[in-house]
């Protein structure tokens, strides 16, 4: 009888222990493995070099569930996370506190897709990049305008923008300026294949010169189909030792990027970028050219045109001419169309 009672009590005790263990497992799972994001969406927090454990917790509070944050704090205390905080951009999502903490502790941050756009100026480029990466626009500008930095990569302050090829690249948020520039140099070399480099040389250009002409072509039109024809016209002028007389270079020199008319008084503006005043290519690109414009220069159309003028129908394409007389007729038609629309 006594043995039977003991067996029942033992069985009952095992059930209680099993229940407690089961509840413990469920609680542990809830705290360690349930989604950490309080919104149910993937969120990102940015840990800076000067963040401490309190500022990290403050950032986590904004995007984390209370129970997950509690679990994160317990692990942080056990593993002395406050002494080893790693900067970066970290994901707060469907993963639980355990995996999230491991990512924070080991510096396993989420990468960022950074698109290098076909922009006009170094300032525009620096602004785009600084919105995605940790360093500031001013810090990047200081590097890009430093003679020592430009020389290190084989460029001048005027043509350093030629190192950047439009594309989307992956970076970590805490990437340094030095690492960023090395990556851009590597991607530039990858873009300039043997075939592209040979075509540039066969056309009489260095890579930087090809990028410079491509930047003018890019400014002239958004019509990619017309780009090789425009490139051919400018190459014809270069071969004949004629000034390029490219309107976009005057706009660049004056900073009047949105001008629809080029006034005669502007043509004498003293700037090495003014191709009405100075023969040859300007000292560097007037924007980061799109890939289509670069390839247009490398694969330009052979023809006899020396002049072009925007069409009076405002289609974005151009009338081409072999003689100045023909060009004058085209220019007059375009000028009248501007006046008719009240465009200054």
Would you name each region that the model predicts?
Residues 16-31:
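Hydrophobic membrane-insertion alpha-helices, especially the h-region
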Residues 1-11:
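N-terminal Lys/Arg-rich, disordered targeting/topogenic segments
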Residues 37-192:
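Signal peptide-directed extracytoplasmic domains
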Residues 127, 133-138, 149-344:
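Bacterial extracytoplasmic/cell-wall-associated proteins, especially those involved in peptidoglycan
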Residues 3, 15-17, 42-43:
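Non-catalytic interaction surface on structured domains
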Residues 13-17, 33, 251:
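A generic signature of intrinsically disordered, low-complexity regions enriched in glycine/proline
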Residues 10-13, 327:
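Hydrophobic, aromatic-rich alpha-helical transmembrane segments
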């Amino acid at each position: 009888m006594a043995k039977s009672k003991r067996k029942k009590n033992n069985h009952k005790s095992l059930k209680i222990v099993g229940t407690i263990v089961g509840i413990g497992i469920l609680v542990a799972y809830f705290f360690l493995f349930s989604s950490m994001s309080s919104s149910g969406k993937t969120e990102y927090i940015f840990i800076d070099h000067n963040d401490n454990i309190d500022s990290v917790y403050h950032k986590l509070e904004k995007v984390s569930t209370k129970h997950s944050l509690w679990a994160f704090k317990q692990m942080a205390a056990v593993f002395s996370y406050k002494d080893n905080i790693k900067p970066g951009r970290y994901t707060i999502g469907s993963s639980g506190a355990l995996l999230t903490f491991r990512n924070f502790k080991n510096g396993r941050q989420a990468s960022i897709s950074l698109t290098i756009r076909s922009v006009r100026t170094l300032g525009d480029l620096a602004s785009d990049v600084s919105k995605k990466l940790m360093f500031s626009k001013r810090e990047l500008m200081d590097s890009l305008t430093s003679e020592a930095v430009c020389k290190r990569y084989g460029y001048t302050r005027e043509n350093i923008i030629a190192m950047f090829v439009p594309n989307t690249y992956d970076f970590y948020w805490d990437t340094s300026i030095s690492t960023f520039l090395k990556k851009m140099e590597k991607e530039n070399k990858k873009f300039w294949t043997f075939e592209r480099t040979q075509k540039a040389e066969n056309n009489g250009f260095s890579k930087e010169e090809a990028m410079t002409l491509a930047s003018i072509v890019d400014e002239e039109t958004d019509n990619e189909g017309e780009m090789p024809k425009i490139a051919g016209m400018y190459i014809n002028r270069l071969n004949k030792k004629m000034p390029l007389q490219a309107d976009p270079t005057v706009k660049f020199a004056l900073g009047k990027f949105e001008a629809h008319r080029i006034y005669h008084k502007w043509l004498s503006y003293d700037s090495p970028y003014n191709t009405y005043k100075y023969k040859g290519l300007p000292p560097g690109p007037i924007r980061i050219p799109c890939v289509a414009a670069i390839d247009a220069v490398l694969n330009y159309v052979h023809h006899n045109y020396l002049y072009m003028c925007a069409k009076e129908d405002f289609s974005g394409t151009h009338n081409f001419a072999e003689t100045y007389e023909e060009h004058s007729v085209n220019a007059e038609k375009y000028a009248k169309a501007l006046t008719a629309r009240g465009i200054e």
